[in-house]
């Protein structure tokens, strides 16, 4: 339970630094001088999936319009080569076979191309079964049109169903804190699953980025653990999780967090989890700068009890911190011991064990 002399605050970030990874996980790294056009063309599928929706809609529309225009030109050329443009289609010569009825202009050819691709049914314009060229061109347009529709439809489905969208419901705390746990300093952050559907096989890793004097970027791995779970992954992610990094003499952060104004660095945190319904892996990223690490603070309690005894998560306390105060020395009876019940780092209730039993 929270101490009564701890005032809950919500720190506001007042200083901005250049960062490699934004708070929502996007990279700010820019590459100059590298060939882009050919690389993107070779991976057309991946490029289309990574595009923003407005560009996908533009590509979608432009692809179909271009397809209609190309085959409108081909239908017009066929009518020109067959001599159909200048004829009276209501009374053609007896020895002449019209390939497509009533194609007498490019507008009519475009309309026929549109009707063919969308299979809305022919009206006055229709291909003749006695013209092999028209039948061949009709088959080619239908085949390429089906391939284009399959590609565009697949891209839409893949873009909607990609695991990246599920990762948006994973939220990191805006700040990290340095607090004592079991008498040892720890770097702590929290992560929450906003949706009710659980995630499984949760793994967290972190990389510390520092710029050296020679201009090179140095990367160091930083290990985080979740309470007393010995395995590297959390099997079930439904309520907020609290991750700890013990700041020992061997920690890469020990020299950076010894004073109030540490040198500039960036700690990038990666969380990977499996979606229970699809089995796909999603990843969420964030980063912490020195100005976003609160020394001598701890997170406010998130878990509470409802009226029926069920657990509730107070998300309004997710980013709130509590100043860490020294634990007061209280003399206790030699036959009485305090127990603090905690779930994933969140203090829920306090009990005392005495010779006569449990007292709350």
Curated annotation (Swiss-Prot):
Membrane-traversing stretches: 51-77, 132-157
Membrane topology: Multi-pass membrane protein
Residues with site note (Role in the control of polyamine-mediated channel gating and in the blocking by intracellular magnesium): 149
Localisation per UniProt entry: Membrane; Cell membrane
InterPro entries: Ig_E-set, IRK_C, K_chnl_inward-rec_Kir, K_chnl_inward-rec_Kir_cyto, KCNJ13, Kir_TM
Short sequence motif named Selectivity filter, residue ranges: 119-124
One function term, GO molecular function aspect: inward rectifier potassium channel activity
Keywords annotated in UniProt: Cell membrane, Ion channel, Ion transport, Membrane, Phosphoprotein, Potassium, Potassium transport, Transmembrane, Transmembrane helix, Transport, Voltage-gated channel
Reaction(s) catalysed (UniProt annotation): K(+)(in) = K(+)(out)
Regulation: Inhibited by Ba(2+) and Cs(+), although sensitivity to those inhibitors is much lower than in other Kir channels.
GO cellular component: monoatomic ion channel complex; plasma membrane
PANTHER family: INWARD RECTIFIER POTASSIUM CHANNEL (PTHR11767), INWARD RECTIFIER POTASSIUM CHANNEL 13 (PTHR11767:SF3)
The protein's name in its UniProt record: Inward rectifier potassium channel 13
Organism the protein comes from: Cavia porcellus
Designated gene of the protein: KCNJ13
